[in-house]
């Protein structure tokens, strides 16, 4: 299939489970409120975001200080100076957990300059949306109601969580299998859109009635609503994916 045919066959709504679709929605600063709303449905209460003051995608982030090349989908800093790495991982990758920690530690390291004290460090959160399921020791513990895992420093015997430093959050979207009728909460409806946006022909009536973050998320996925520059970039990204 040539590039012209690909452009002709663009779906009317982006697929949020693809890297290109995810980036089209969440790397757009006009959708900052959507990113905040989605993250606040996932993050622990102590990490709740009121606003984002810094916003950069992977094309702009060049300051991670290690020799190995790092590719970050989206990096945000809130008004409390907490850093959030947000990414879509479309396919399984070896040592993925290690990569997440590596990326987070690079940004954690950058928070201090020479002579600054460690109390000036702020938490770094990695939020990875996975379009596949991780391998778990006990698969029975993970299902459509339990598909988000939270990883941080914990004392083994007591279970006491250390002061927030680096946290890794995995969202295993393929474990979310609820039908529309089973989606009752805002959280459920949001992930139903994540799983099904690529198949929408128009914004469903139930989303129009629901409003809130679900409606904003669905509206942001509509390709016809993109401005000329964004649509062209999306088309190019789709041809190259």
Give a label for each model feature.
Residues 1-241:
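Elongated, amphipathic alpha-helical interaction scaffolds
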């Amino acid at each position: 299939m040539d590039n012209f045919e690909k452009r002709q066959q663009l779906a009317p709504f982006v697929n949020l489970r693809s890297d290109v679709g995810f980036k089209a929605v969440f790397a757009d600063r006009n959708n900052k409120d959507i990113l905040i709303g989605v993250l606040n449905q996932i993050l622990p209460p102590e990490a709740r975001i009121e606003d984002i003051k810094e916003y950069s995608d992977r094309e702009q982030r060049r300051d991670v200080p290690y020799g190995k090349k790092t590719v970050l989908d989206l990096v945000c800093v809130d008004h409390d100076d907490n850093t959030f790495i947000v990414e879509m991982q479309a396919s399984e990758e070896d040592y993925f957990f290690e990569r997440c920690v590596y990326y987070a530690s690079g940004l954690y390291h950058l928070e201090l300059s020479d002579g600054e004290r460690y109390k000036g460090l702020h938490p770094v959160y990695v939020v990875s949306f996975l379009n596949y399921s991780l391998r778990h020791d006990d698969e029975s513990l993970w299902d459509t109601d339990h598909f988000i895992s939270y990883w941080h420093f914990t004392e083994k015997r007591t279970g006491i969580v250390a002061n927030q430093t680096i946290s890794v959050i995995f969202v295993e979207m393929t474990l979310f299998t609820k039908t529309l009728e089973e989606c009752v909460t805002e959280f459920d409806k949001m992930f139903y859109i994540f799983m099904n946006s690529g198949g929408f022909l128009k914004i469903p009536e139930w989303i129009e009635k629901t409003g809130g973050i679900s409606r904003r998320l669905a509206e942001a996925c509509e390709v016809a609503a993109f401005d000329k520059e964004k649509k062209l970039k999306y088309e190019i990204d789709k041809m190259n994916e």
